[in-house]
Amino acid sequence: VETITSHVGKNPHENHGIPSPPVYRTSTILNKTMESYKNKDLKYTYGRNGTPTSESLIKAISSIYSAEGCVLASSGMNAITTGLMSLIKSGDHILLPDSVYGSTRRFAKEEFPRLNIDYDFYNSRDLKNLETLIKNNTKAIYLESPGTYTFEVIDIIKVMEICKKYDLKSLIDNTWATAIYFNPFDFGVNVVIEAITKYISGHSDIMMGVVLANNDDLIGIERWTKNAGVYVSPDDIFMSLRGLRTLPLRLEQSSFNSLKLAKFLENIKEVKYVMHPALAQHPDHKLWKRDFKGASGLFAIEFNDNISEEAVNKLANSLEIFGIGSSWGGYSSLISMMNVSESRNIKTSYIPKGVYLRIYTGSENIND
């Protein structure tokens, strides 16, 4: 995969020997004749519908996932809504994990009722209960692995068996692991979503998402994207392709740092629980070890009940390497605090009672 990310999507011999593809900033694409225009002879017809710049990134990401194709979205959340709305319609029912990303939960709660789409949330650690939630109009199961906040690893093999049994579509947010550590297509998932904003871009300076699929699923996603007018800046595409070139190296360092730090935090008496699937004590460690090739740099910790939020704030404010802010996947380390137990848009199978801190380790030296 290191070789693929280094070379796919570029053809310097078609570009005056220049390794990086050019950035095409355009809306209009000109035809030589009216006959050519009417017959749509050109490969590219309008800037929003694709250019050589977007084609380079589409080809590259599709290759690392061994997918037939993909569409680019303006953000990770736009990729999620694109994946959802291309698979379900008015009158359908969908199942989502209880620990799903807060913005995805909010979209379901606020938009699905308006669109006459029914939904239920399931506990990703209780798949027997998942099967009882399936209705006659259920069309799809949405997955995250691990869960966004408390890092539950779902048994994807069992979920795929359920999907096959009831003829359901499946889609998954794979931002945490990327194709480097986990390829959902190997398990039969229909649609894979990733926030390019995070690891692929890797520099915390652009926002973008991607939705990958095969066959009819890809056709549906491409149709929705075109009808919804989804568009991504060519400059952002260029920077994402730049980030993709070093993805395996950055992910390896981020992963190394996170596991080292997680093991260190396991031995801190003020810490009650380290939510990192690569740790042997994690409830889903065996599932992670079975399905994943590695762990990314994002995890969380819960402090003991007697540790106050003020004390954790003081600790966070004193850190020199870690920035305080949302998002993750870039080259620098970040921390953020969330009230997981009381948020309207965050629900988890494990509810932390102590102060919760989410940690992302970047590319720094672990000894610093």
Describe each region flagged by the PLM.
Residues 109, 118-120, 131-132, 136-139, ...:
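PLP-dependent enzyme catalytic core of the Aspartate aminotransferase-like
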Residues 240-249, 297-305, 358-362:
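Short, well-ordered beta-strand elements within core beta-sheets of diverse protein domains
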